[in-house]
Amino acid sequence: MASHAGQQHAPAFGQAARASGPTDGRAASRPSHRQGASEARGDPELPTLLRVYIDGPHGVGKTTTSAQLMEALGPRDNIVYVPEPMTYWQVLGASETLTNIYNTQHRLDRGEISAGEAAVVMTSAQITMSTPYAATDAVLAPHIGGEAVGPQAPPPALTLVFDRHPIASLLCYPAARYLMGSMTPQAVLAFVALMPPTAPGTNLVLGVLPEAEHADRLARRQRPGERLDLAMLSAIRRVYDLLANTVRYLQRGGRWREDWGRLTGVAAATPRPDPEDGAGSLPRIEDTLFALFRVPELLAPNGDLYHIFAWVLDVLADRLLPMHLFVLDYDQSPVGCRDALLRLTAGMIPTRVTTAGSIAEIRDLARTFAREVGGV
């Protein structure tokens, strides 16, 4: 069922929302995960942490919305923005990773290199893309306790607003590159197997935007090394739609092993996630990420999925099930998007931290990340 906890959990966000005035009312979905799946554990006297992951296809408006949010809130110690690690991607981890990715796809599309050659480059580049997220998640994880829900939960002592969750580079973009022919399904599942366990209080904000407007926004923005690739745009939009459907499928009782036989291997159009879908019907497995992996490369001679790949799909289900999913309507002004995000935070779930010093350590971690790898 939809989770309605959290009205008292984000006072700074709430105050900014009230100060920003009325909007046109286009907000986003309520969280799709059941309330209380992870009740507060540990010392109830310890402070709470709210983590918000703004994710979705590139060019939809995530960074602009986050910038509007931070500007509205103003400088404060209890809210920290964690940007994309562009300096790591372009300098520290490798040289011009984004340029390498787009050029490799372009060369593959023109027939200048083979799919195998492209896959080698893409897989290596995607490791670079995922490293900052995976490392940061690992350092943060020991500080995250159980979910703090109910009237006794205090307001967050610290809120982190992340530009993307680790699943972007460990699941969504590898899957999109697979759809583009520049990564193998085996490589995609290798990344999935490395997805870290989902910590309590993972509030994931995806988004919807008409494709024509999305393409127009992407064409107008300037990012280092980026090409306007409409085929890739369609692929990544499809993957994020599948992601939203998969979370809802799992949280509404879907079991991929039981439904696997319904897959035929023929891809169909994927329904867009509905921002107002709080506790709707069970999505079909055909409309989830599981459908991408019923392909000959992963099947044994008898037609069954090899056990090793099935175990990876179990990992995928395990990682997605606990997420608190929100869907933001980006088809409005930056201020409208900001206000919609502010309203969404009322339903987000914080967690207790694990030590008295955790809040200070987490704040320092986030600021170090932003300072060291968050530049352009």
Curated annotation (Swiss-Prot):
This is Thymidine kinase. Phosphorylates and thereby activates certain drugs like acyclovir (ACV), valacyclovir, and famciclovir to a toxic form, that leads to successful suppression of the infection, while the uninfected cell does not have this ability because it lacks TK. Mutations in thymidine kinase may induce HSV resistance to antiviral therapies in immunocompromised patients. The most frequently observed resistant strains are unable to express TK and are avirulent in animal models of disease. GO terms for biological process: DNA biosynthetic process; TMP biosynthetic process. Keywords: ATP-binding, DNA synthesis, Early protein, Kinase, Nucleotide-binding, Transferase. Pfam families: Herpes_TK. Used in molecular biology as a selectable marker to identify transfected eukaryotic cells. Used in cancer suicide gene therapy to selectively kill transformed cells. InterPro entries: Herpes_TK, P-loop_NTPase. It is an enzyme of class 2 (transferase). Its EC number is 2.7.1.21. It comes from the Viruses. ATP binds at G56, P57, H58, G59, V60, G61, K62, T63, R217. The gene is TK. The keyword Transferase applies. Gene3D superfamilies: P-loop containing nucleotide triphosphate hydrolases. Catalyzes the transfer of the gamma-phospho group of ATP to thymidine to generate dTMP in the salvage pathway of pyrimidine synthesis. The dTMP serves as a substrate for DNA polymerase during viral DNA replication. Allows the virus to be reactivated and to grow in non-proliferative cells lacking a high concentration of phosphorylated nucleic acid precursors. The active site is at E84. Disulfide bonds: none annotated. Residues 1-47 are annotated as: Disordered. It catalyses: thymidine + ATP = dTMP + ADP + H(+). Homodimer. GO terms for molecular function: ATP binding; thymidine kinase activity. Belongs to the herpesviridae thymidine kinase family. Substrate binds at Y102, Q126, R223.
